[in-house]
Amino acid sequence: MRTRILHRWKTVCLGGLLGFSSLCAQAEGIGYTPTPENLQARKEFQDGKFGIFLHWGIYSMFGQGEWYMNTANIDCHEYAKAASGFYPSRFNAQEWVAAIKASGAKYICITSRHHDGFSMFDTKYSDYDIVDATPFKRDVIKELAEECRKQGIRLHLYYSHLDWTREDYYPLGNTGHGTGRTSHGEWATYYQFMNHQLTELLTNYGPIGAIWFDGMWDQPDGFDWKLEEQYKLIHKLQPACLIGNNHHKTPYPGEDFQMFERDLPGENKAGLSGQSVSALPLE
């Protein structure tokens, strides 16, 4: 999520999210037909109206917002050293979920991996994660997932498309130029890495209500993110899992709801074309 929102969402933040939703099939016409369980999940998401967003990562320790690595031009190797001091000893999934549920929220969305590239779950495709790189050694996403199931609240996962640390995130986009990454790389391996992680999240953590993508705006228009293949993977693994993408464009086939940042649905201050945007559930 972009740095301009930092004054509104402090890290770690609890952002209340109101869903302004309508059910329709605008983005389904080309190559995507949602399953009955997906349509039911859309209805439940629309009816839920209110969720809580947990923006949490090693950036939280700096108190400078989630874009600190980029805005301060911190070398990715120096930034990664912060993981050795990340020990959220007071984290209690049962208490967090209970408090959120008591607020009336119907779902929780948490950053599984933000733009700094640090994974808040135990992944076998990188050592740069909360289990392998920190003294905490606990998978907070798994603990939250288990507690959400116990308490009857849905878990959504935010996942960044861009990465300021990995060398295979190339070509470099509009951000992260001061983080010490290489000037060359292999996009195909990065794309494979993302899909491997998404497979882990949708296989090892039980039912996931939605995947919230962010960062597509880092690359110029026309860049091939291979969204169709990625979205098909998600819906194959969990047909009821909803997909949203913070790109502020007309929805792509495979997306089940639309999210807005620095905007309220209907105001369109962020430059969305305005064409057919009311055809999907809006967040």
Feature-to-residue mapping (PLM):
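Bacterial N-terminal signal peptides that target proteins for export
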Residues: 2-16
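Helix-centric, low-specificity signal for extended rod-like, repetitive segments
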Residues: 1-3, 19, 35, 42
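Mature catalytic domains of secreted/periplasmic carbohydrate-active enzymes
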Residues: 26-283
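A generic structural signal for short, solvent-exposed coil/turn residues
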Residues: 10, 17-19, 44, 235
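Hydrophobic h-region of N-terminal signal peptides that target proteins for export
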Residues: 16-26
